[in-house]
Every structure is written in structure tokens, then in C-alpha cells.
């Protein structure tokens, strides 16, 4: 339709926006859905969407005039309109939190929400009135912003926003730490430990609650700590001593580790970052742990912080039994892909007897009770007399059979179905016990063939941070 020259990139755009919208339909987006605090989730998702939107726009500009209307309808509009929905809701969430914190930058995000709202209107009007000379006038009339129930709103409605009046008396520095919705201007705090096996950067915000710019310095007391300043319009290079800045709104301090500066044989090192500005001082402890994974088998996931997150397709063993075989479903699920047994009409199987299974290996730094969260597709039972079950076992324990969607769901339990539809996922928790520190084996058995596995998250010490997509995948040996 649009020529071989553009086929590969158009396919990338279409795969991207259908995958991203599969996580959560745009009409079911709200400001609270994605976390703007934990796991850098909202910013990561928006950056992914921005990348494919920019690609879609680049293609549009290069297409011949006679192809632009069809491309706008089939590719550019659904991609960019979805991106604008994500941007509007994420910026709304930031505006509300930052206003609560007294941050001057709340006003910038209010402006960005207004801009996204106007852009959405302009795109819909172009679709209705200009594209193909108005052939599809009215197609994009349905309101999609301000939804409060199952019926669509009559008109698009702007979300409620907050504006901040800066405090008088000059600049007033604050610091916002990763994975926290609090801001501080004094005291000593600690970042999550860095590990040499992950490409890790932690980001700290230095911001302002006052009516004039904040001048600040960030000083590292150890040469292995690298820091850089990131602003809305440019990013400095990493340095290993002192970084300086001035901001009326927010600057971001990225922190990472220069592993070449850690002495050989050291398993753990510590240092401090000191942030000074407007007469305030905040000290942040930095810890770096060195892991030796050279002797671990291939595809072993490594525990570095009490949480092990595993994408379904990164198994160690895929064992076919009873006529069933686990296969990858690309681009389906919260993040990477999913695994499902085929053929779908396969009869119920018994774990440990004739059930095909996936096996995963992981290390754990602690023993005792732990929780496994299994992310699966919100598939309903495939027949009236069956549920939708899978089975799970860790190490030598007896397999637990887990019901994801009962065939006899009680009247009044519609929220189970509703939640699955809204989230395009069900998350099931099972309890297990790790008796020793070693490489552990986790098996997921098919019971009902409709079960589709998206990801696994092991929580060893109740340290999972709340987010929509769940923790990013942990390091595993290659």
C-alpha cells in the first residue's frame, strides 16, 4: 500500500502501538494507572510511545500526497492519538503530585496537559473535516477523555489540574528520591544498592518551591560514583567529583557506578552523595555490590534486591508432554511476550504426570517464605464445566494447582472479570518456602490448555514497589 521502502518501519509502528494499547486500552487510561514514582514506569512507557510516534510522523512527511490520507487513517492517527492519551494522563498525574509537593514544575505539566488536549482535538478535526476531503466526517466525534463509567462522556473533558504559587523569599531547594512520593530538604537517605551485573542508573530530582532559581552542588566522596545533571533541554556529561547546577523548576541527577574504580576482590563498597543548595543539605548513601556469576548455569536469574522478575519466554527448559507444547506468542503481554500450550483443544493434564511444563532457574539471597506472582492473560474458561487452571512448584515441593478464572464464579463477582478486561492481565499470588541458599527451580505446568503465561515475579522480602507493569526483568546469565 505504501511501498516497500516504508514497509519495515510501518510494521514497527503498528506492532508498537497495538502492543502498547494491549497493555491498557486508551479509553481505560486514567492518571493513576501508570506509576510516576516507582520503576521509572510512566517515563519509560511514554518514551516508548514517543519513539514510534516520531517514526510514524517521519514516514508521513516522506509519503507522496496521494498516500497521506490512507496512512493518516490507518497508521498515524491511531498511533499519535494513543500517544497523546498516555501523555495527557501521565502529565496530569505529575501535575497533581508535584502540586501536592509544592513543586514549581507542577505548572509546566499543567501546560503540557493543555497542549495534549488541544492536539487531540486538532487531530480529530483533521480526521473528520480534512482527511479525504471530509469523507469520514464524524468518525472521531466520540468523546474519549473524561470517562467515568461504561457509557462514554458527551464531550471530551479536561482533567482537573492544580497550579502552584511559588513560595516567596527566594529559591527553596528540595530533593525527590527514586521510588518515593515525598520531597525532602535535609537528612540522610539511601539509594537501592547498585549491582555490577545490571546496567543501572538511579535518578534523583533537585527542584524548587520558591520564586527564584536554586543554585546547588552535588558532590561524590568516592571516585566510583558517577553523576550527571539532566535538564529539560540538555544533559551534561558524567563526572566523578562535583556537579553544579541552577534551576527554577526541576533538574535530574543521574547516578551510576564506574565499576573499574572498585578495587579487585571487593564484594561491596559504600560512598555518599552530598547535595547543597539554598542553605540546605541532603546526604544520600550509595552502595555498590559485586556479584560473581561466572559459575552460574545459562539462563539463571540473579537476586540482587529481593525481587526476581522473569519474562515468560526466558525459560531454562521447555518440556513437551501429553501431546502439548509451550510456544512463544510474540509481543503479547505486559512487556516482552507470552507462552501458551498448543493445541488449545488439549485435554486437562495432571502436573508431574503428563503435563507440559516450563522450568526457570533463579538464585535467592534469603531463605524462608516468599510470594510468587504469576502474570497471565485474562482468558475465560474454554468450556462450561472447566475453569482456567495452571500449576506451580518450586524445588521439591508438591505442585499447587491455581484457578485463574473459576467456572462457577459467584453472582456479584463481576469485578474479577472487569479487572481482567481493564488490565488485560490477571495476577495470581502463591506462597512458597525457600529452605536454603542455592539455585532454585521453578516450574509452571499446564493444567488447562487456554492458560497463557506473561511473566513471573518472585518477592523474597516484601520489597516489590507498586506499578502497573510490574518490576522490570532481572539480570540472567547468557
Q: In which residue ranges do the predicted regions lie?
A:
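Catalytic domains of carbohydrate-active enzymes that cleave complex glycans
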Residues: 1-209, 308-329, 339-348, 356-364, ...
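Extracytoplasmic
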Residues: 197-478
Amino acid at each position: 500500500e505504501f511501498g516497500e521502502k516504508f514497509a519495515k518501519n510501518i510494521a514497527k509502528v503498528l506492532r508498537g502501538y497495538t502492543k502498547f494499547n494491549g497493555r491498557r486500552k486508551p479509553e481505560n487510561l486514567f492518571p493513576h494507572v501508570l506509576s510516576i514514582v516507582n520503576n521509572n514506569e510512566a517515563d519509560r512507557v511514554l518514551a516508548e510511545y514517543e519513539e514510534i510516534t516520531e517514526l510514524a510522523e517521519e514516514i508521513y512527511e516522506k509519503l507522496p500526497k496521494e498516500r497521506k490520507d490512507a496512512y493518516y487513517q490507518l497508521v498515524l492517527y491511531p498511533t499519535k492519538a494513543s500517544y497523546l492519551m498516555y501523555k495527557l494522563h501521565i502529565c496530569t498525574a505529575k501535575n497533581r503530585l508535584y502540586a501536592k509537593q509544592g513543586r514549581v514544575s507542577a505548572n509546566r505539566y499543567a501546560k503540557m496537559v493543555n497542549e495534549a488536549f488541544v492536539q487531540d482535538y486538532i487531530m480529530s478535526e483533521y480526521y473528520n473535516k480534512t482527511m479525504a476531503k471530509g469523507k469520514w466526517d464524524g468518525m472521531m466525534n466520540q468523546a474519549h477523555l473524561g470517562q467515568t463509567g461504561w457509557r462514554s462522556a458527551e464531550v471530551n473533558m479536561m482533567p482537573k489540574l492544580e497550579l502552584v504559587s511559588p513560595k516567596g523569599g527566594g529559591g527553596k531547594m528540595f530533593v525527590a528520591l527514586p521510588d518515593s512520593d515525598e520531597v525532602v530538604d535535609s537528612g540522610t537517605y539511601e539509594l537501592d544498592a547498585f549491582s555490577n551485573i545490571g546496567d543501572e542508573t538511579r535518578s534523583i530530582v533537585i527542584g524548587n518551591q520558591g520564586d527564584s532559581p536554586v543554585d546547588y552542588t552535588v558532590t561524590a566522596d568516592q571516585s566510583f560514583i558517577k553523576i550527571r545533571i539532566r535538564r529539560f533541554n540538555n544533559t551534561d556529561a558524567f563526572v566523578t567529583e562535583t556537579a553544579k547546577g541552577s534551576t527554577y523548576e526541576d533538574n535530574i541527577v543521574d547516578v551510576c557506578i564506574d565499576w573499574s574504580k572498585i578495587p579487585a576482590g571487593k564484594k561491596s563498597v559504600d560512598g555518599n552523595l552530598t547535595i547543597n543548595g539554598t542553605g540546605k543539605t541532603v546526604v544520600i548513601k550509595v552502595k555498590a555490590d559485586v556479584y560473581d556469576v561466572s559459575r552460574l548455569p545459562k539462563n539463571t536469574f540473579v537476586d540482587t534486591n529481593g525481587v526476581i522478575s522473569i519474562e515468560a519466554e526466558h525459560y531454562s527448559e521447555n518440556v513437551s508432554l501429553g501431546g502439548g507444547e509451550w510456544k512463544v506468542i510474540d509481543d503479547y503481554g505486559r512487556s516482552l511476550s507470552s507462552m501458551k500450550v498448543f493445541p488449545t483443544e488439549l485435554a486437562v493434564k495432571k502436573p508431574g504426570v503428563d503435563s507440559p511444563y516450563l522450568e526457570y532457574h533463579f538464585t535467592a539471597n534469603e531463605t524462608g517464605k516468599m510470594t510468587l506472582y504469576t502474570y497471565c492473560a485474562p482468558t475465560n474458561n474454554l468450556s462450561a464445566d472447566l475453569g482456567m487452571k495452571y500449576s506451580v512448584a518450586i524445588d521439591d515441593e508438591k505442585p499447587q494447582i491455581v484457578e485463574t478464572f473459576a467456572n462457577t464464579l459467584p453472582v456479584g463477582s463481576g469485578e474479577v472479570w472487569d479487572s481482567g478486561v481493564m488490565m488485560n492481565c490477571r495476577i495470581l499470588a502463591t506462597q512458597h518456602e525457600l529452605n536454603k541458599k542455592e539455585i532454585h527451580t521453578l516450574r509452571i505446568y499446564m493444567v488447562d490448555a487456554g492458560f497463557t503465561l506473561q511473566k513471573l515475579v518472585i518477592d523474597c522480602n516484601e520489597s516489590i514497589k507498586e506499578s502497573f507493569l510490574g518490576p522490570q526483568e532481572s539480570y540472567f546469565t547468557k
